[in-house]
């Protein structure tokens, strides 16, 4: 069975200009399946539109949203959308959220009701059905980590912590797990090696770094003697990058190889929408241009 060419996105954070750019790009590159690792909402000013698109693309019976003009032939493969810590906070009580993040969650909770009663119910039903983790025949998917799918951060310094690495990889039943949450793209190997993509001089003009063979157990047809240790891949953030690069980040995966995609989008438009909502702190707009 051929693995569907998959676009893996995370941490959209109610940023429609970034998400639209990412989705159009993924379709143009031939993506037939969409996996969202959570945090569709939070921080940004357009949670309803971001949810609308995920409720059509990242589901078991996906379809192309009518207001997303893309060229696509054939049928989409079943997608997946997971719960991030911001969805969890929205459905419960924000825990360990700073005041700015908490303000955005409280505003988002009210905003979801502004599209009408029926649509509001649809949003809450979708959010209530989100799973904390998922998997297919090749890969696992989580927002935070394999150990704590919703809340745990995995960051580059963790590659120097053998005990944490062992605990992170222990629950894995596949050769690779894709995560988000930290908003910093990277590949963490079980033996402590780390790869942090630098999508600049090594990047083609189209904003892609890769493809890179994961070479991990259970992916593709890599000979056994060439297989690398298992890997955790952070796909970065579409809506609020935090690695010093304001360009959106996502990953393409064909079952064996990954490519990191970094793209410019209309940061000013996304920021202006946040500035236009008095309940959202200006800082949430200002940070977008800094990639922090």
Where are the model-predicted features located?
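Acidic, His/Gly-rich catalytic cores of divalent-metal-dependent hydrolytic chemistry
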Residues: 190-292
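Active-site environment of divalent metal-dependent phosphoester hydrolases
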Residues: 13-18, 42-45, 86-91, 147-149, ...
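Active-site neighborhood of phospho(di)ester-bond hydrolases with catalytic His/Asp-centered motifs
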Residues: 9-10, 34-38, 43, 80-85, ...
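N-terminal active-site segment of His-dependent metallophosphoesterases
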Residues: 1-59, 65-70
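Beta-strand-turn-beta hairpins that frame and shape the catalytic cleft
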Residues: 2-6, 134-141, 226-232
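Short, glycine/charged-enriched secondary-structure capping and boundary segments
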Residues: 21-24, 49-52, 95-98, 155-156, ...
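Glycine-rich phosphate-binding loop signature in dinucleotide/nucleotide-binding domains
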Residues: 26-31, 136, 170-173, 226-227, ...
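Active-site neighborhood of divalent metal-dependent phosphoester bond hydrolases
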Residues: 56-148, 152-173
């Amino acid at each position: 069975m051929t693995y569907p060419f998959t676009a893996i996105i995370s941490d959209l954070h109610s940023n429609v200009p970034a998400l639209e750019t990412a989705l159009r790009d993924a379709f143009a590159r031939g993506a037939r399946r969409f996996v969202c690792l959570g945090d569709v909402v939070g921080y940004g000013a357009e949670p309803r539109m971001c949810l609308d698109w995920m409720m059509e693309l990242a589901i078991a019976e996906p379809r192309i949203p009518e207001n997303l003009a893309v060229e696509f032939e054939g049928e989409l493969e079943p997608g997946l959308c997971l719960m991030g810590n911001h969805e969890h906070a929205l459905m419960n009580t924000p825990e360990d959220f700073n005041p700015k993040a908490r303000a955005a969650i409280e505003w988002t909770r009210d905003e979801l009701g502004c599209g009408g009663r029926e649509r509001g119910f649809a949003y809450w039903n979708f959010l209530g059905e989100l799973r904390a983790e998922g998997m297919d025949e090749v890969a696992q998917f989580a927002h935070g980590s394999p150990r704590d799918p919703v809340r745990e951060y995995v960051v580059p310094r963790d590659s120097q912590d053998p005990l944490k690495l062992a605990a992170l990889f222990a629950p894995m039943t596949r050769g690779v797990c894709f995560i988000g949450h930290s908003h910093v793209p990277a590949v963490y190997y079980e033996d402590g090696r780390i790869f942090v993509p630098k999508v600049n001089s090594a990047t083609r003009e189209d904003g892609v770094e890769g493809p890179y063979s994961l070479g991990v157990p259970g992916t593709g047809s890599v000979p056994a003697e060439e297989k690398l240790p298992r890997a955790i891949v952070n796909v970065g953030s579409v809506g609020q990058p935090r690695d010093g690069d304001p360009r959106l980040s996502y990953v393409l995966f064909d079952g064996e190889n990954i490519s990191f995609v970094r793209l410019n989008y209309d940061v000013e438009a996304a920021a202006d929408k946040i500035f236009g909502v008095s309940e959202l702190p200006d800082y949430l707009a200002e940070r977008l241009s800094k990639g922090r």
